[in-house]
Amino acid sequence: FTGIKGVGMTALALCAQDLGKKVSGSDTDEIFPTDKVLKQRKLKPKVGFKESNLPKKLDFLIHTGAHGGSTNLEVITAQKRGIPTLNLAQGLKLFTKDKQVIAVAGVGGKSTTSSMLAVLLDSAGLLPSFSVGVGSIKNLDAPGRFSKKSKFFVVEADEYVADPTADKTPRFHYLDPSIAILTNIEHDHPDVYPTIEDIFAAYKIFISNVPHNGAIIANIDNQGIKKFIKTIDKPVTTYGFSPQSDWQIT
């Protein structure tokens, strides 16, 4: 894992461990919120990015979009050796294959909502897999987990591009969610989305990946979402304080 200390990367590294894979990684020596959980899981990142960091036997390399993304020396070295390389979004797609994905998207509240969902499903005895962009989740003690016993996989779905250097695909376009939860939509990441209409277009593609027997759940209190759901042709279940919501918070 090149850039293993990033929150999304750590979550996937822990999923790989849960699958019984031998995991190694590299990153800078900066302090990260994932340092504690990596230490607990006996994952000691190598400092810096070097050819020698790559084990002789390597099934695949997953890399962050940071630290040069696909132009990182370790990624280039792996490719020269014929080792498959995946960016974080592609790696997440691999881990969520054959799972019932619950994807939480929005400009704000993604981490909190997906963490709450993971805790609730776990408390209900459903033992979900999850990948959330935080240092750790209270009561679960990790930002990521792969559960062979559960069909559910809770994912924080990010609208930013997968790899600024090589793959401008929004990360959440790689997902195939059974359930999509939209917390809010605002104009964000102007380097990628010049206008709010560009963001709406990205969310439309994300929503198009939800099957007709799936579910779209959205916060009707948010003006961006209120405008957005009028533009899609799939049923939406709404929640919020508004009397117009299907599930009203009182």
Language-model region placement:
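Conserved N-terminal Rossmann-fold NAD(P)-binding element of oxidoreductases
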Residues: 1-4
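Helix N-cap at the beta1-alpha1 junction of Rossmann-like dinucleotide-binding domains, i.e.
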Residues: 6, 28-32, 243
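N-terminal Rossmann-fold NAD(P) dinucleotide-binding loop
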Residues: 9
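Phosphate-binding loop of NTP-binding sites
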Residues: 15-18, 39, 53-56, 69-218, ...
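NAD(P)-binding Rossmann-fold cofactor-contacting core
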Residues: 21-37, 128
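Short acidic-hydrophobic, aromatic-tinged amphipathic segments that line or gate anion-handling sites
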Residues: 45-49, 86
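BRCT (BRCA1 C-terminal) domain core and associated BRCT-interaction motifs
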Residues: 48-65
